[in-house]
Structure formats: C-alpha cells, structure tokens
Amino acid sequence: MLKFVILLSAVACALGGTIPEGLLPQLDGRIVGGTATTISSFPWQISLQRSGSHSCGGSIYTDRVIVTAAHCLQSVSASSLQIRAGSSYWSSGGVTVKVSSFKNHEGYNPNTMVNDIAVIRLSSSLGFSSTIKSISLASSNPANGAAASVSGWGTQSSGSSSIPSQLQYVNVNIVSQSKCASSAYGYGSEIRNTMICAAASGKDACQGDSGGPLVSGGVLVGVVSWGYGCAYSNYPGVYASVADLRSWVINNA
C-alpha cells in the first residue's frame, strides 16, 4: 500500500505533457469492495515492511526472491526493509525476514510507470508450507475478460490512511493491453506493452496493495502498479505485465 497520491498540480511540469487528457497516474494502492481472507488462500502474498510498518505487497517467486513494484522501492535502503510471510495479518504471525538487497528494473520510469517491477533478495530462505508458497510467473497474458484476483492490505476506501489488519482480496477480470488502450477506456497511449489492466464489474474495486499480486489461472500475471482511482468505471486498475517482464525477473532473481 503506497500512502500517497501524485497530484496533478504538483508534477505537471515535470511530466511535460507525456500523460494525455491532463491526468496523471494515481498511486494509491487499496482494495475497495474486497473481502477478508486467509493466507492459505494466497500463500505467495507477503507484506513488504519499512521500519516495521506495512508499505507494499509482493509475491514469493523463490524461497529467497520476492517480486514487487519498482515504485515501492524508491528512496529506501535495503537495511530498513523486511518482509512478513505466512500470515493473514501484516503485523503479526508467520515469519519475518530481513531484505539483503533489491533491484529495480533499469527501464522503470516514474512518469509513465513503464517497467514497474523489482526483485527483492532475502537475507535467509523462506521455509515453504501450506501458508508460504512460491507462485510461477505467467508466460503469456491471459485473455481479455479472464477471471483473476488481487490481494493485499491496501486501504479500504479512497483517502483513508488506515489499513486493515487482515488480508483482503477482490475478484476482477482481465482487460487486455489492446482493450485497455482502446477508446473503450480513458487511458489511451498511457498503456504500454509492459502493462496489463483489470477491472471489477459492478464493484468499486480497482487495485490492491501496490506491488501485490494479480493472479489468474494459478500464475502471477500482474504486479499492482497504478490507476486513476476506483470511482471511474472507464479507468481500470493498471498492473505491470509479468509475461512481458518475465525474462527480466528470471535474469535478475
């Protein structure tokens, strides 16, 4: 969960008009309209913590590597980070492991949010169990409309500064790159080939914890990246596309 919003008035000059329609990416990881769940249903989910407080979500790729979003790891040192795995609660239970290092995608651009992916290396190995499991990386993007789920400890309402203690999830449907960039939605050319979208029909839900998992067909298909807020039906949640960034993750894990 990233507790800030990039405001138009603050950064319009810096972006130099790269974002059309006068809108800027809003990084406000949250699960709105979600349901409490247990870690056994999402055993790859971790809480990325900065100085002991939850800051982002992530997914277990191997027993020593976590996949998360690059925007979660800006202006932070590895020594201040740890992860909690194997617990439905971000503040207790399971196991905590210190972060030894991390690497952001070299092509990550905070203005366009392209290549918004990173790998975290742990100081010791996770012991796999029914509540701590790795998840495979998608090798191709799911079809438009495919069922998916997103999980995390994001704030449950727009503008809220508090987060739930228990893991939340929401069911969504994939919106393909081409569909998300089409006139059916409002993003247009902001959707790049390293992104995939998802939306929840009939719910006020768009995205979960920043850096957290979007899962479809039992594999990791997306990493929660950005969006224009859950109130707008023509702006789905936007995720880093794992299929398009798979090679980078494998080569840098």
Curated annotation (Swiss-Prot):
One Pfam family this sequence matches: Trypsin
Q: Which SMART domains match?
A: Tryp_SPc
One GO molecular function term of this record is: serine-type endopeptidase activity
Show the catalytic activity.
Preferential cleavage: Arg-|-Xaa, Lys-|-Xaa
Identify the catalytic residues. Answer: 71, 116, 210
A Gene Ontology term for the protein's cellular component: extracellular region
Q: Which GO terms describe its biological process?
A: proteolysis
Site Required for specificity: give positions. Answer: 204
Which InterPro entries has this protein been placed in? Peptidase_S1, Peptidase_S1_PA, Peptidase_S1_PA_chymotrypsin, Peptidase_S1A, Trypsin_dom, TRYPSIN_HIS, TRYPSIN_SER
Q: Which cysteine pairs are covalently linked by disulfides here?
A: 56-72, 180-197, 206-230
Q: Where in the cell is it found?
A: Secreted, Extracellular space
Keywords linked to the UniProt accession: Disulfide bond, Hydrolase, Protease, Secreted, Serine protease, Signal, Zymogen
Q: Which residues form the Peptidase S1 domain?
A: 31-253
Question: Which residues would be cut away as propeptide?
Answer: 23-30
List the EC numbers from the record: 3.4.21.4
Signal sequence bounds: 1-22
Name the predominant localization: secreted
| Recorded family membership | Belongs to the peptidase S1 family.
Name it: Trypsin beta
Q: Which gene encodes it?
A: betaTry
